[in-house]
Structure formats: structure tokens, C-alpha cells
Design a protein with these regions (language model features):
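Conserved catalytic loops of ABC-family nucleotide-binding domains
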Residues: 161-181, 185-187
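H-loop (His-switch) and adjacent beta-strand-loop-beta switch element
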Residues: 180-209
Length: 210
């Protein structure tokens, strides 16, 4: 297990309104944030891990430290505006692999493959981003804000399709997902989950017991 410590600090404001808030709600200053997690970053037995918790609870900060040299992946970033999705995904890769990835995550509307990413719907953008990750098939990937902007029905099918497709990839590839929605736990069936709200890390067996 790898110990990850998050220490975030900002200015402690002493304005009238800040003082009123502290007094009325018995709130602390809010300038210090500390989170300690013991996570299986260096272990190879798992395929999909999940860090879940409310916004501002340290998920992204943990993700940035999880694997040395690995940055957070934004599914919506880095798409060219002058190329259709089918050309933008793994441009040097196999055509059939790209179309299979698009279909596997539920982006089966072929005309959407011929549009640039920025004109797609929110749900289509998520699926296209997921298909790009699957096509690139990195040994390790950390996906930030997983399903965060999606309608939950769309998120359900998208998350299930991605998790199923990821587990089909060859080799022991590992994917860490960061999400503010607990409903994804049921849909992706992670091998382990860390909840920033409780500070607990549970494996799949413990999750089933709970």
C-alpha cells in the first residue's frame, strides 16, 4: 500500500462576512485541508480503482500523486476542432479497433463519428472520450471527473460499458477513476474504492459485504 498525503492551504480571511460565517455556523477557518490515504497504487492485482467523494474533498489531489509521472486525464481535452471524432481517435491506429471502441461504449450512432468533438452532446462527448482511452489502451490511466457532468441514466450505461470494455483489454492495464457520484460504484464494480468522506479504502469483497 502506498501512503498519500494531501496538504492544501489558502489564506485565512478575517473580513466581517468571513467572521460572521465562522460565528454563525461554528465553522473553522477553512484554510487548511489535510487528507491521508493508504492506497494500492503499487499493487498489480486490480484493474479498476475508484476514488469517490464530494467536490473539494481531495480526489484530484490524490490522483495527482497516485502514480509518479502520470497526470489526470480529462476526457474532453485535446480534441481537434477540424477533424471528425473517427479521425481524432488513435489517428495512427487500426480503423476497426477505433470503430469497435466507439460501439463498445455505446456511441453507435454512426453519423456522430463524422462530427468534430465540440458539436457532440454531453453524453456523446463522454462516450467519445471513453472510446479514445480504450483505443489508446495505456498501461495506466487516471480519469478525473468520471461521469460528473452526465445525466445519471446516461452515466449508468456509459460507466457500465466503459468498465466492461476496459476489463476486456489485454494485459494488466489499470484505470483509476475519480468521481463525485457514489452511484458509479454499482455500475463499474471497482476492485477497490476509497471514499474521501470516510477515509476508508475497501476492496471488492468488503464492498459486497457492505
Amino acid at each position: 500500500m502506498k501512503k498519500i498525503e494531501v496538504h492544501n492551504r489558502c489564506s485565512d480571511f478575517d473580513s466581517y462576512r468571513a467572521a460572521r460565517v465562522k460565528s454563525l455556523f461554528n465553522a473553522e477557518s477553512g484554510c487548511n485541508f489535510v487528507l491521508v490515504a493508504e492506497l494500492p497504487a503499487d499493487e498489480t492485482w486490480w484493474r479498476i480503482g475508484l476514488i469517490v467523494g464530494p467536490s473539494g474533498s481531495g480526489k484530484s489531489s490524490i490522483g495527482k500523486q497516485f502514480w509518479e509521472g502520470e497526470t489526470l486525464t480529462d476526457l474532453s481535452a485535446g480534441w481537434p476542432a477540424d477533424r471528425p471524432v473517427v479521425d481524432a481517435i488513435a489517428p495512427d491506429g487500426d480503423f476497426n479497433a477505433v470503430t469497435s471502441a466507439l460501439a463498445s461504449v455505446g456511441l453507435g450512432d454512426v453519423p456522430s463519428w463524422l462530427r468534430p468533438f465540440h458539436v457532440l452532446s454531453v453524453g456523446e462527448k463522454f462516450r467519445a472520450g471513453a472510446a479514445r482511452v480504450l483505443s489508446e489502451a495505456p498501461e495506466r490511466v487516471i480519469i478525473d471527473e468520471f461521469t460528473s457532468a452526465l445525466d445519471r441514466q446516461v452515466a449508468r450505461f456509459g460507466a457500465m460499458a466503459f468498465a466492461k470494455s476496459w476489463r476486456r483489454l489485454d494485459g494488466g492495464r489499470q484505470c483509476l477513476l475519480l468521481s463525485c457520484h457514489r452511484d458509479v460504484v454499482e455500475w463499474i464494480q471497482p476492485d477497490w474504492i476509497f471514499d474521501t468522506a470516510t477515509g476508508k479504502c475497501l476492496n471488492a469483497q468488503a464492498l459486497r459485504i457492505e
